[in-house]
């Protein structure tokens, strides 16, 4: 059954590669729906986007991402709680603001999705700490273990300590 599930997910991922949405499908927030978005070598492909508007004008966003990187990680995640992880991804936890996917690799990768701002971030402890302490800033960070960054803009607190690094 596990093998069948994996085959199905790979098939869906393949379909996603050839069915990228147009810019008209962008949702409320800052996320830009592009066919292929490279973030620190991690390819994130939006496979499905749903926006459900509730009676009280709140909304539920549902996103599924296929992430394929040098770590050979394929993660299938949905913000609304319907999720499944394959390959070496072990667990996922989420709340109303973020998703954390922890992958069993020599480098632990956490994928944070800010449900309010629509930002993807890759990091581990420091980013998680920044999110816990200053969630008002959202998550706009991308680093890997060797701290190599594409281009960055630091947000510092009043003491000069870097709260997070925005990757452009």
Locate each region found by the language model.
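Lipid interaction determinants
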Residues: 20-168
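Sec-dependent bacterial lipoprotein signal peptides
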Residues: 1-18
């Amino acid at each position: 059954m596990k093998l069948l599930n994996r085959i199905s997910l790979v098939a869906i991922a393949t379909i996603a590669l050839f069915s990228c949405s147009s810019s008209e499908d962008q949702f409320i927030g800052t996320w830009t729906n592009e066919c292929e978005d490279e973030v620190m070598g991690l390819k994130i492909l939006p496979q499905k986007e749903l926006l459900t508007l509730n009676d009280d004008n709140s909304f539920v966003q549902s996103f599924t991402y296929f992430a394929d990187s040098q770590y050979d990680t394929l993660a299938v995640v949905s913000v609304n709680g319907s999720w499944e992880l394959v390959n070496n991804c072990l667990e996922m936890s989420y709340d109303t603001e973020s998703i954390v996917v922890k992958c069993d690799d020599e480098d632990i990768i956490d994928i944070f999705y800010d449900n309010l701002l629509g930002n993807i971030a890759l990091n581990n402890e420091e980013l998680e700490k920044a999110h816990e302490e200053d969630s008002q800033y959202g998550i706009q960070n991308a680093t890997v273990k060797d701290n190599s960054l594409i281009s960055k803009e630091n947000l510092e607190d009043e003491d000069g300590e870097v709260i997070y690094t925005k990757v452009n």
